[in-house]
Design a protein with these regions (language model features):
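C-terminal accessory module of base-excision DNA glycosylases/AP lyases that mediates lesion recognition
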Residues: 1-4, 71, 75, 96-106, ...
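Short, hydrophobic/amphipathic alpha-helical patches that form generic packing surfaces
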Residues: 8-19, 75-79, 123, 166
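A general alpha-helix detector
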Residues: 9-14, 27-31, 101-105
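Short alpha-helical "patches" and their helix-cap loops
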Residues: 23-38, 87-100, 134-143
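Alpha-helical ds-nucleic-acid-binding substructure associated with the helix-hairpin-helix region
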Residues: 37-108
Length: 166
């Protein structure tokens, strides 16, 4: 997964609280649009900070029921990526090895608990064709079963980008 796809999946996971799964997908894409990440990811990502994220989240219509708290979580994810993944979002997913270990990595991000981490892993595994068992979605998360096809399309749309270092 490239940097855009990696950050999208991480942020969609963080934002997946107090709103429907369908709304999370729409709002995460809209957040990328508001921040300019869908067009000039590498340049815009370098300049992200809490203030820019909060402004994008609180612009009408707000992108979450709790936009300021989510802005803190999203900005925190940028700082975690800087500190532990050399400022490169894709490194979080490149280092995927064993599901339990990866779940623990995801749970270090503010706003991601066990269920959200498992959901992100399921989406990642599906996208990378590591696991195509659709019954898993029904058992783990009914919302995911409804949205997995949309999620795959969004990840495809974020497509390939060049190597990136913050």
């Amino acid at each position: 997964m490239n940097n855009s796809q990696s950050l999208y999946l991480l942020w969609a996971t963080i934002l997946n609280q107090s709103q429907s799964a369908e709304q999370v997908l729409l709002n995460t894409v809209e957040l990328f649009n508001r921040l300019g990440l869908n067009e000039e990811f590498n340049e815009k990502y370098k300049k992200l900070d809490y203030r820019k994220i909060e402004n994008a989240m609180t612009q009408k219509p707000c992108l979450h029921r709790f936009p300021k708290n989510m802005s803190i979580n999203l900005a925190g994810s940028i700082y975690m990526i800087d500190k532990y993944y050399d400022g490169t979002p894709s490194k979080l997913f490149e280092e995927y090895d064993e599901p339990q270990e990866f779940k623990e990595k995801l749970m270090q991000f503010r706003g991601i608990g066990e269920h959200k981490a498992e959901t992100a892993i399921t989406i990642f595994q599906t996208y990378k064709k590591i696991n195509n068992n659709r019954n898993l979605f029904r058992n783990k998360c009914g919302g995911l079963y409804k949205t997995i096809e949309k999620e795959m399309k969004i990840l495809d749309e974020f497509g390939e980008d060049k190597d990136y270092d913050r």
